[in-house]
UniProtKB/Swiss-Prot annotation:
Disruption phenotype: Lethal when homozygous. Component of the spliceosome B complex. Interacts with SMU2. Auxiliary spliceosomal protein involved in splicing of specific pre-mRNAs that affect multiple aspects of development. Required for proper accumulation of SMU2. PROSITE patterns: CTLH (PS50897), LISH (PS50896), WD_REPEATS_1 (PS00678), WD_REPEATS_2 (PS50082), WD_REPEATS_REGION (PS50294). The gene is SMU1. Keywords: Acetylation, mRNA processing, mRNA splicing, Nucleus, Repeat, Spliceosome, WD repeat. SUPFAM superfamilies: WD40 repeat-like. The keyword Acetylation applies. Residues 40-92 form the CTLH domain. One of its GO terms (cellular component) is Cul4-RING E3 ubiquitin ligase complex. The keyword Repeat applies. The modification N-acetylalanine is found at A2. It is found in: Nucleus. This is Suppressor of mec-8 and unc-52 protein homolog 1.
């Protein structure tokens, strides 16, 4: 059952924040536009005491921020004017009588009452009986204090900050926010350090070891940079702390060893753009959608007749694009749980697919050596092209395609050759990068740095190749694993790479 919160209460919390931080103009504007009154004081007892003692210099600033019934406000201001006349503070009495809005309204609607104060003001003496009638000054104060106090309440100070603090503590308690983590309140995520300069990693920081009979088939960083997830041939999906290289035990389900998992090897994973959901695809053609914070499976799809080779969320997180060994790409609806679109036309495995940045097209890469561009709504194939063949002349399987950050109409195409290409969606080669290897160095995987300044490729020779976009040259290469490397992924904000291999390890690299 959803917890309902009154909109007026939210406004009052905002008004209190404005009041406590002396944002007086904002306070008045918000109160006027929303027609919501705060009507709080720090202490009712002190407020009553100030009225009973005639400490009007303390009472007036508080009253100016309250919405009181007009008759009670008039009684209060009348009492202040009479007491100022009694003290012969005639300038103050005159200013209140002639310059305040309350007295101005009284002059128009209760002329006789108003003129009585004007007459008392110009007299050379003060007669308490004439001013207060059968009552006394003290009794008048007490009556006003009692009447005004009924209109105000007391709430704890700094409610906005207190509520935010409580929310953050709850997130920590639930394992959603690791202790000691800086939090970006505006974005609603833990604050992440962002590397200013895009540069290639070359130092091994951590080696994550899997079981002797297990290795990672896929790994991905979350878009917010908080998580590194891996999926393995043993069916397990694990979330890692890339800073320590250890399993994230602040996720309670992992601390309890209740891991996300499939019955078959998990070949691919992908995060939603808000980093809240993780999709996983397995060798038996099934897809599962998980809540990354809780490890709860929220949706299952019998998506393909054969293994799922790649997954990609739509920008708004409402759809999931999948590819398979069954030669198709498909779009699934997360809310409906149904197949929405199917893309047929490849004659071999579809290895990878992505949405274009505006979501209007999808791009697929296949072992039939082609890249296809499709209309995501009509499923029409708009373009089919092949990357340039290797020097030996035969076409090569296309492993993956990647959006290029520097131009949304360009893609990075990795096929099983020793070259990688930046191409247009019409199939024209914009730029190419080559390792120079004639044999044994064909690329099996690739990724692009956040800003697009570096393109990273993994070769069959177990080496990482780092290409500089500006120079077009191979700036660095190094051996990264002892056995065949399966894939590579780049952190969204940091100069950090993760590589994973059949040697049962995943390695983290930084500059």
């Amino acid at each position: 059952m959803a917890l309902e919160i009154e909109a007026r209460d939210v406004i009052k919390i905002m008004l209190q924040f404005c009041k406590e931080n002396s944002l007086n103009q904002t306070f008045q504007t918000l109160q006027s536009e929303c027609q919501v009154s705060l009507n709080t004081v720090d202490s009712v007892e002190t407020f009553i005491s100030d009225i009973n003692s005639g400490r009007w210099d303390s009472v007036l600033p508080q009253v100016s921020q309250l919405k009181l019934p007009r008759n009670k406000l008039e009684d209060l201001y009348e009492q202040i004017v009479l007491e100022m006349i009694e003290l012969r503070e005639l300038d103050t009495a005159r200013a209140i009588l002639r310059q305040t809005q309350v007295m101005g309204v009284m002059k128009q609607e209760q002329a006789e009452r108003y003129l009585r104060m004007e007459h008392l003001l110009v007299r050379s003496y003060f007669d308490p009986h004439e001013a207060y009638g059968d009552s006394t000054k003290e009794r008048k104060r007490a009556q006003i204090a009692q009447a005004v106090a009924a209109e105000v309440t007391v709430v704890p100070p700094s409610r906005l900050m207190a509520l935010i603090g409580q929310a953050l503590k709850w997130q920590q308690h639930q394992g959603l926010l690791p202790p000691g983590t800086q939090f970006d309140l505006f974005r609603g995520t833990a604050a992440m350090k962002q590397d200013v300069e895009d540069t290639h990693p070359n130092v091994l920081t951590h080696t994550i070891k899997f079981g002797k009979k297990s290795h990672a088939e896929c790994a991905r960083f979350s878009p917010d940079g908080q998580f590194l997830a891996s999926s393995s041939v043993d069916g397990f999906i694990e979330v890692w702390d890339y800073i320590s290289g250890k399993l994230k035990k602040d996720l309670q389900y992992q601390a309890d060893e209740s891991f996300m998992m499939h019955d078959d090897p998990v070949l691919c994973i992908d995060f939603s753009r808000d980093s809240e959901m993780l999709a996983s695809g397995s060798q038996d053609g099934k897809i599962k959608i998980w809540r990354i914070r809780t490890g709860v499976c929220i949706r299952r799809f019998d998506a393909h007749s054969q293994g799922v080779t790649s997954l990609s969320f739509s920008r708004d997180g409402s759809q999931l694009l999948s590819t398979s060994f069954d030669q198709t790409a498909r779009i699934h609806g997360l809310k409906s749980g149904k197949l929405l679109k199917e893309f047929r036309g490849h004659t071999s495995y579809v290895n990878h697919a992505i949405f274009t940045s505006d979501g209007s097209r999808i791009i697929t890469a296949s072992s039939d050596c082609t890249v296809k561009v499709w209309d995501s709504k009509t499923t029409d194939c708009l373009q089919t092209f092949k990357p340039p063949p290797p020097l030996r002349g035969t076409d090569a399987s296309v492993n993956s395609i990647h959006l290029f950050p520097k131009n949304t109409e360009h893609i990075v195409v990795c096929n099983k050759t020793s070259s990688i290409y930046i191409m247009t969606l019409q199939g024209q080669v914009v730029k190419s990068f080559s390792s120079g290897n004639r044999e044994g160095g064909d690329f099996v995987a690739a990724c692009v740095s956040t800003k697009g300044d570096w393109i990273y490729c993994i070769g069959e020779d177990k080496k990482l190749y780092c290409f500089n976009y500006q120079s077009g040259g191979l700036e660095h290469f190094m051996m990264v694993h002892e056995k065949d490397v399966i894939g590579i992924t780049h952190h969204p904000h940091r100069n950090l790479l993760a590589t994973y291999s059949e040697d049962c390890t995943m390695k983290l690299w930084k500059p």
